[in-house]
Amino acid sequence: MKKAVLAVLIAAFVTAVIYAVPINGETEIYNKVVRLHVIANSDSEEDQALKLAVRDAILEKVSSATENCSSREEAEDVISSMLPEIVKQAEKTLRDNGSEYHVSALIGKENYPTREYGDIRLPAGNYSSLRVMIGKAEGKNWWCVLFPPLCTGTAKPDDTLVAAGFTPGEVRILTDSESPEYTLKFRILEIFGSLFS
């Protein structure tokens, strides 16, 4: 019985390792996207509303500044240079809504779960990310894609992705709703990962 349990555990581990390696262009997807992660002070209704107001202000400010960027690196440089402005805009938005919370922001690598944004499905992985933390940052998250601008609804997703340098194959990976192969693989990783978190 112990050998059978050990064999199952080893098989599960090997499967997880195999599926943890990005395949079929996923690494290139990770390298072409800047995500946005806004974290509320708490889960209270007021703090969640403030999070959404900050989100809207950041999307407006950053989207206009990065609209002519043609790569993740270029967008990341623009966003990095704007960090003090982003914090200032977020805090102004909070003050305008009667809050005195402090805001911090940084750009770096961050792990994201699989997420769907309309017709786009981004695989779980380690992405470049603008992380904005409001107050104690103990509330619910809000995640989206800052570059290419998939959160603003300003363009068709396929056109936006192509303009940002995605290949037709990468666009298919992101937009193909008929690809259970990807869904199954990522779901297996999510389930396996949740067992150890």
Predicted segments, located by residue:
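Soluble extracytoplasmic domains of inner/organellar membrane proteins
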Residues: 119-182
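Structured segments of extracytoplasmic/periplasmic soluble domains
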Residues: 57-69, 85-97, 153, 191
